[in-house]
């Protein structure tokens, strides 16, 4: 069995799909379906069982077994960068992750987990997986950073795989439930389909992010599991492309519309990553040599998926 926490969420459900694509269906999805709309992410996938996150946590804490577990992909977390309830964030992202990590270590189960580029904070260069480059801007980033620091202490003594991935700006299928936290590509598509002018912040040609297609993220996860490589790795393309490039790709697909530029919100000033670009030195040194989709390629594929029933 393979366990995917957050398996009904964005990245988790794409990992389930990638596992299905290589013939795995003995998958336990752990999630919180209080937001019932997330079920759509699993509707076309094959899994063996579903468990609520709180029930799962109780079983982990009591040391109950789940049979023979080949790997745990831990994608379950609060991923809202605008959530400021620190207690909730630390319980959900830090404490729960520690409990699950120790459960896996005791049983020598490979543990692959979601970290985040939010650990780097507001820097504009040197996105390198090392303490001196890390300074998160929000409590979400801090919760991810703190768990990475915890993992760093344990890695030298670990007898089984521990791998963390610092996801950069992920976009693609199965993110519709995320609301305001969904990618710019998702929102632009919605606006275009509603007959509205797609909106970007003023200066969007200067806001550059490392946009990575979710299919590439899932491929990275599976490769590291299949190759047993431990460590903390950036998971981006190594390229910074502008929000304008995302919009251009969306407009090219829809063949209509023009961008409406809106003022940058006061509440995001100083708390907004204006630039991200993954340093892939460690990822490539670990042996991962597959290419990553450009924004033009990935957004075109995503638009086709979003509009497949249109």
UniProtKB/Swiss-Prot annotation:
The keyword rRNA processing does not apply. Substrate binds at residues 169, 180, 187, 201-204, 209, 272. The gene is hldD. Pfam families: Epimerase. Homopentamer. This is ADP-L-glycero-D-manno-heptose-6-epimerase. It comes from Cronobacter sakazakii (strain ATCC BAA-894). The keyword NADP applies. Its cofactor is NADP(+). Belongs to the NAD(P)-dependent epimerase/dehydratase family. HldD subfamily. Catalyzes the interconversion between ADP-D-glycero-beta-D-manno-heptose and ADP-L-glycero-beta-D-manno-heptose via an epimerization at carbon 6 of the heptose. Contains a large N-terminal NADP-binding domain, and a smaller C-terminal substrate-binding domain. One of its GO terms (biological process) is carbohydrate metabolic process. The active site is at residues 140, 178. Binds 1 NADP(+) per subunit. Pathway: Nucleotide-sugar biosynthesis; ADP-L-glycero-beta-D-manno-heptose biosynthesis; ADP-L-glycero-beta-D-manno-heptose from D-glycero-beta-D-manno-heptose 7-phosphate: step 4/4. Keywords: Carbohydrate metabolism, Isomerase, NADP.
């Amino acid at each position: 069995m393979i366990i995917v926490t957050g398996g009904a969420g964005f990245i988790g459900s794409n990992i389930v799909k990638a596992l299905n694509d290589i013939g795995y269906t003995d998958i336990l999805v752990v999630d919180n379906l209080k937001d019932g709309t997330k079920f759509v992410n699993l509707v076309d996938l094959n899994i063996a069982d579903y468990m609520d996150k709180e029930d799962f946590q109780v079983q982990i804490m009591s040391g109950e077994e789940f049979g023979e577990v080949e790997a745990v992909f831990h994608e379950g977390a609060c991923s809202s960068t605008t959530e400021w309830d620190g207690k909730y964030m630390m319980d959900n992202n830090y404490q729960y992750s520690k409990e699950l990590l120790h459960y896996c270590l005791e049983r020598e189960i490979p543990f692959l987990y979601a970290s985040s580029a939010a650990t780097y904070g507001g820097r504009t260069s040197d996105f390198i997986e090392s303490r001196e480059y890390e300074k998160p801007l929000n409590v979400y980033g801090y919760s991810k950073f703190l768990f990475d620091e915890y993992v760093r202490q344990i890695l030298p003594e670990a007898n089984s795989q521990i791998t963390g991935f610092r996801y950069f700006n992920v976009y693609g299928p199965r993110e519709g439930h995320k609301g305001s936290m969904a990618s710019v590509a998702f929102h632009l598509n919605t606006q275009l389909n509603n007959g509205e002018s797609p909106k970007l912040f003023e200066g969007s040609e200067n806001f550059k992010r490392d946009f990575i297609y979710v299919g590439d993220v899932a491929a990275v996860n599976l490769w590291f599991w299949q190759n047993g490589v431990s460590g903390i790795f950036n998971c981006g393309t190594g390229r910074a492309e502008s929000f304008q490039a995302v919009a251009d790709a969306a407009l090219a697909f829809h063949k209509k519309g023009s961008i409406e530029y809106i003022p940058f919100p006061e509440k995001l000033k100083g708390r907004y990553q204006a630039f991200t670009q993954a340093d892939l030195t460690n990822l490539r040194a670990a042996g991962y040599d597959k290419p990553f989709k450009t924004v033009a390629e990935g957004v075109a594929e995503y638009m086709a998926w979003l509009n497949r029933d249109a």
